Structure formats: structure tokens, C-alpha cells
């Protein structure tokens, strides 16, 4: 069951995707989409979008 996305202002390190040669070492806003099975899809916004697929609880 997919819950509503959670929006949080927290620091983190993206490890799955970096756009072009721009590596975001931290992000100010994240949107988490729990997709079940312990997996979460996370969208992060600082200056560019960053997408992560995260295993485990956040």
C-alpha cells in the first residue's frame, strides 16, 4: 500500500543518480514515496532533481 509522500527538509547523500557531472552532496528537500517491501523512492531537490531508490527505513 502506497502512502502519501513525505516532504522533509533534511540533509542526505544521494547515491543512486546524479544529473550530468553535478553531484549533490546534500539536499534541502526530499520527497519520499514508500513503495512497499521495505523500498522507498526518494526525489530530492536542491538545484537539480535527484532520484534515489532506498532500501530500508528512512
Curated annotation (Swiss-Prot):
This is Uncharacterized protein TP_0012. The lineage of its organism: Bacteria, Pseudomonadati, Spirochaetota, Spirochaetia, Spirochaetales.
Amino acid at each position: 500500500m502506497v502512502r502519501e509522500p513525505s516532504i522533509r527538509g533534511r540533509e542526505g547523500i544521494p547515491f543512486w543518480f546524479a544529473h550530468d557531472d553535478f553531484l549533490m552532496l546534500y539536499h534541502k528537500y526530499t520527497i519520499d514515496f514508500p513503495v512497499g517491501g521495505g523500498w522507498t523512492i526518494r526525489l530530492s531537490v536542491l538545484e537539480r532533481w535527484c532520484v534515489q531508490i532506498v532500501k530500508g527505513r528512512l
